[in-house]
Amino acid sequence: MARITVEDCLEVVNNRFELVMMASKRARQLANGVPPLIENNSEDKPTVLALREIAARKINSKMIDEIEKAERERTEREAMEWAAAEVVADEDISKSDD
């Protein structure tokens, strides 16, 4: 596949600074296991894959923010479930000590 350039992405995102923010957020999501929206036949690194998605108009800042919010909510929910399980385990240990 042809090399991706900043100019390719600037056709989609008008501001270089916004492009950097979008690409870095999306690359972080991809690195954390969020599935890509385009095929990754060449096993590109998350940063390159993020830029390819932006250039292909498969992702925008609103979508990135929604994915980020969903991931944050999932992480918080898992933390709450873990904390609740710890409380139950602590209560069980306290009861067995009596």
From Swiss-Prot:
UniProt entry tagged with the keyword Transcription: yes
Entry's Gene Ontology cellular component terms: DNA-directed RNA polymerase complex
Catalytic activity: RNA(n) + a ribonucleoside 5'-triphosphate = RNA(n+1) + diphosphate
Pfam families attached to this UniProt entry: RNA_pol_Rpb6
GO terms classed as biological process: DNA-templated transcription
Coiled-coil parts of chain: none
EC top class named in words: transferase
Membrane-crossing residue ranges in chain numbering: none
UniProt family annotation: Belongs to the RNA polymerase subunit omega family.
HAMAP family for the chain: RNApol_bact_RpoZ
Quaternary context: The RNAP catalytic core consists of 2 alpha, 1 beta, 1 beta' and 1 omega subunit. When a sigma factor is associated with the core the holoenzyme is formed, which can initiate transcription.
Protein name: DNA-directed RNA polymerase subunit omega
